[in-house]
C-alpha cells in the first residue's frame, strides 16, 4: 500500500492578519489545507477576540519560531471600564461592577506604574500550566486556580483617547509573555475601578507588521500557488535583529554537519566587530540561512541547522 502524501515542503514565513473569532490554531490548520503544506506553526498566540499580526512559519522556518515569540509586540487595546469579566475580556461572564470611570488625567498619571519591568499574574483563562493541566481547563471545570506572578516588560504604554467615559484606547509595546488582558485588569484596579479588554489588535510581532500582513481570504485565493507568492517571506525574515555572518561553501558544509567554524577564518575576510562571546548569529551562504549558531571560545558553533 502506498504511503499517504504529507504535503509540500514549503519553507518561509507568512504574516497573516488574523480576523476576530478564530483561534491561532484554526489559522494554522486552514493554511495547512489551503497551501498543502507539510509543516506549519505560528509565532505567537492571539486570542479569538484579538485580530492582527499572526506570523506563520512553514517547514524549516519553524526552527526560528522562538526568536519571533521573544520579539517585541505592539498592540492597540480598548479597555472597558466598570465591568470585570472572568476571562478578563468581553467574552467572559460579568463577575464585578463599578460606577467609577477614570478620566484621562488619572489614567495618564497611572501609566508609569505599568511601564518597564513589572510583575503580572496571567489570566486564569490562559494556557499557563498548573500541575500539568492548562489553567483554562481548571477554570472551566470550576476549580480554584491560583497563578504565580511573573516578570514581564512593558516598553511603552500610551493613552490614545478616551472616546467616552466607559472606554480607554491604548497603544502598548511589550516584550514576550505579557498578557494584555491582565494589563487591562490590573490598570483598572489601580484606578479604583474594574475593567476588561473590549477589543485588541496586534500591530506588530517581531519584524512582522500589520502593513505587510495578508488576509486569509487572500491566501485562499492563491491556493496552492501561495508558496510562490511574494507574500511568502524567506526564513531569514524572522531574524532581522540577529547579526549575520557570511560563510564560504566549505564553512557552510561544516556547520551543516554539526561542526564548528573558526572565527579566525571568518575574521580574515570579513569584519566581525561587535560580536560577543555567547552571542547568537545567523550563518548565511549567499544570503540564505544555513544555521543559527553561537559564538563560543573563538568558534561559531551550530545551534539549529536548516535543511533546505
Curated annotation (Swiss-Prot):
Gene Ontology BP terms: mRNA pseudouridine synthesis; tRNA pseudouridine synthesis
Leader sequence residues: none
A single MF term (Gene Ontology): RNA binding
Record keywords, A-Z: Isomerase, tRNA processing
Reaction(s) the record says it catalyses: uridine(55) in tRNA = pseudouridine(55) in tRNA
Active-site residues annotated for this sequence: 47 (nucleophile)
EC code(s) of this entry: 5.4.99.25
Stored Pfam families: TruB_C_2 (PF16198), TruB_N (PF01509)
Name of the top EC class for this enzyme: isomerase
Origin superkingdom: Bacteria
Family membership: Belongs to the pseudouridine synthase TruB family. Type 1 subfamily.
Functional summary from the UniProt entry: Responsible for synthesis of pseudouridine from uracil-55 in the psi GC loop of transfer RNAs.
HAMAP family: TruB_bact
Protein name (Swiss-Prot/TrEMBL): tRNA pseudouridine synthase B
Organism annotation: Rhodospirillum rubrum (strain ATCC 11170 / ATH 1.1.1 / DSM 467 / LMG 4362 / NCIMB 8255 / S1)
